[in-house]
Design a protein with these regions (language model features):
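Extreme N-terminal leader/targeting segments of oxidoreductases
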Residues: 1-18, 33-37
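A conserved short coil-to-beta-strand element within the FAD-binding core of flavoproteins
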Residues: 187-201
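Glycine-rich FAD pyrophosphate-binding loop
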Residues: 35-56
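Core beta-strand elements of the Rossmann-like FAD/NAD(P) dinucleotide-binding domain
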Residues: 14-16, 210-220
């Protein structure tokens, strides 16, 4: 709490090279990268860091295997290389994980075709992970006896990556890195909007806890507010060609007993 109060007191002193609004993964990474390059950076978030979209992930860093079916190969290639970069850059935080999937009899694709797809996926990732495996029913029963293979034609196993701790911790480590490099970060500080004053951005902010307002001066303003990007642009009077279109996904976890 004392660190937060100290950082808030520094926010309206002097001029920052960059003010970043939003402490999710994009804002946190931007703060760490810019601070590492020697820029003076301030980062604020109206809630907890990684307190919204960035803490509602599946904790996976994947290469987009499902997009092979829609033939979006360029995207799969890009995602696989990004996944590899994360594993290589943060080996204690992002680690390889194996996935095993069974294939029901009568499925629209033959098991050999799906297995070939996992090899394409592996090759798009430059063979960075362990090789895929084609599994027959007998092998699945031997290696994973908890899986019900009564109606299975076989299965396959391939690799992706996951966040070893969790998504929020992963994000905060970038916030911490930014502060270690001289950046100023404060949560529960809401941007009320910004205006131009010559070559500077003047952002009016409010301490959500005590209600006090302050002005933050910066040469550059980065709006990394996630789902609140459009709302903040309206507050600031910024017009953009593109706007957010929200979507929601579901990751369903079932009781282990229901698969036996």
């Amino acid at each position: 709490m004392k660190l937060r109060e100290s950082n808030i007191q520094k926010l309206d002193r002097g001029v920052y090279d960059v003010l970043i609004i939003g402490g999710g993964i994009n804002g946190a990474v931007a703060a760490a990268a810019l601070s590492g390059k020697g820029a003076s950076v301030a980062l604020i978030d109206q809630r907890d860091f990684a307190g919204f979209t960035s803490q509602q992930s599946s904790n996976l860093a994947w290469g987009g295997i499902k997009y092979l079916e829609s033939h979006d190969y360029a995207l799969v290639r890009k995602l696989c290389l990004s996944r590899n970069h994360l594993i290589d850059s943060y080996p204690s935080r992002v680690q390889e994980i194996r996935f095993l999937s069974t294939i029901e009899k009568g499925f629209r694709f033959h098991p050999w075709f799906l297995w070939a797809g996992t090899w394409v996926y592996w090759l798009f990732g430059n063979g960075f992970t362990k090789i895929p495996r084609l599994l027959f029913k007998r092998a699945i029963n031997r290696e994973e006896p908890a899986i019900n293979t009564q109606n299975a034609a076989g299965g396959f196993e391939y690799s992706d990556a996951y966040l070893h701790d969790n998504d929020s911790r992963f994000v905060f480590q970038f916030v911490r890195s930014a502060m270690d490099r001289g950046g100023i970060a404060a949560n529960y500080v809401e941007s009320l909007g910004a205006r131009r004053d010559g070559d500077l951005w003047i952002t009016q902010a409010r301490d959500v806890i005590d209600g006090k307002t302050l002005d933050i001066r910066s040469k550059v303003l980065i709006n990394a507010a996630g789902p609140f990007v459009d709302e903040h642009n309206q507050r600031t009077g910024e017009q953009t060609e593109h706007h957010h279109l929200f979507s929601k996904g579901i990751h369903l976890i079932v009781d282990r007993k229901s698969i036996v």
